[in-house]
Amino acid sequence: MNESELKLQFGKPLQITPRLHIKQPTIKEIEKMDGKYEKYLSLLITQSRDIADVLWVKANIFYEDIKSEWLFFIKNCIVDGEAAPIYILKNDSYIQMNDAGLVINKEYTDALNYFFETDGIWFTSSITACGIQQLVLINAKEKHGIYYLDSNDKPLQINESVYNNMVDGLAKLNWIKKEYQFTKGGTKDATTYFLEMEYRKRIKKKKDRITISTIFSSLVAKGHRYKDVKKYPVYFFYESYFRLLKISEYENTMQALYNGCIDTKNHPINYEKIDWSSIIK
């Protein structure tokens, strides 16, 4: 994933493998989805640490005991999955596969198909690569209720490496930076105490403080044209918001400096940090 920032600002998809890319919608397209975008995004990027408090309080599962986020993801995919036969189409004949697993549930299928701009279904399978057995998701076509792979085409696959790239890519496109305060707890007892506190905060929290809607309003209030913001690719939309915060920080610092509110001798200004045209970290 070496996509330049400029390409992402221009709305280009994020390539994660030679054959798989992540779709980058505009804000107008997201609005038309009526909440499905946020739902699909959450399904694909949520990992054990993101719901560590829920896992501990509701299921008595400690997040550090989950050794593989990939297997955790697969487990969620196959809840209500379907044990359906998968066929290989060869010379106009359907031959049933022997090593096909479960067809993943509709929610995860829709999420993967949306972001990867694919269709059909995804099913689990165990393959051997470089002498190592791996669990993968394979994309199959669907016709008249029959799930099949075309013997003339190499099917799309998601393995653990592709999954990790997908999570990182979606976080990059949507400017999601994950921080976990409970990991600073030290001992397990201290950590679980923090998790229980986090859970209490979660159930009291009615809605997010900052949303796509509030960012949209902020950009318009700061002079971005309404009709232009609707056309912003999601990466540029968030980048514009965080750039706006850097500009505000710079303006506030300069105003305080002009009014003599900053003792620059004892508290020198880090101009590199407040440079609003610098790379946002």
What are these regions (language model features)?
Residues 1-77, 164-253:
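An amphipathic, hydrophobic-aromatic interaction surface with interspersed Lys/Arg
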Residues 35-37, 42, 48, 53-127, ...:
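Protein-protein interaction interfaces in oligomeric scaffolds
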Residues 26, 108, 119-120, 128, ...:
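General structural signal for secondary-structure boundaries
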Residues 92-204, 208:
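Hydrophobic, aromatic-lined core segments that form the binding pocket/scaffold
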Residues 257-281:
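Long, intrinsically disordered, low-complexity Ser/Thr/Pro-rich regulatory/activation regions
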